[in-house]
């Protein structure tokens, strides 16, 4: 009965996110719509907390000297320069979790509001896509 809370909590974990959270919910027997919504909500809550924390930290620290970026952050920076916040938000989940991607975008100076908006769109799209694939996979296995 409270499985959706477990799905929400799981989806808040980086690398589980809305996509695997939705799959977990479907495999646990939740209604797919409930599983996807719970996964999306959990992922969005954790992402917003990270974005707001990164924004506060950026405001406190002000402009800092350029530091040496890790290879993943360098790749993320190149993606930001090439595709902007929408592209990184939609494609960044193939490289890093939304929490890390969104925090890095804010740290790089992107608009907090824009990051949250595009990350929500991305989280919904990825959650729906993987939730749908999970439903199709379960149906395929059950009907074999």
Predicted region positions:
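Hydrophobic alpha-helical transmembrane segments and immediately flanking/interface helices
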Residues: 100-124
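Transmembrane helix boundary and interhelical junction motifs in multipass membrane proteins
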Residues: 11-24, 94-104
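Membrane-embedded alpha-helical segments of transport systems
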Residues: 15-16, 41-49, 121-130
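Membrane-interfacial helix-loop-helix
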Residues: 1-8, 27-97, 113-114, 132-144
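Surface-exposed beta-strand edges and their flanking turn/coil or helix-capping segments
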Residues: 104-105, 130-132
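Hydrophobic side chains within alpha-helical segments
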Residues: 20-22, 46, 84, 102, ...
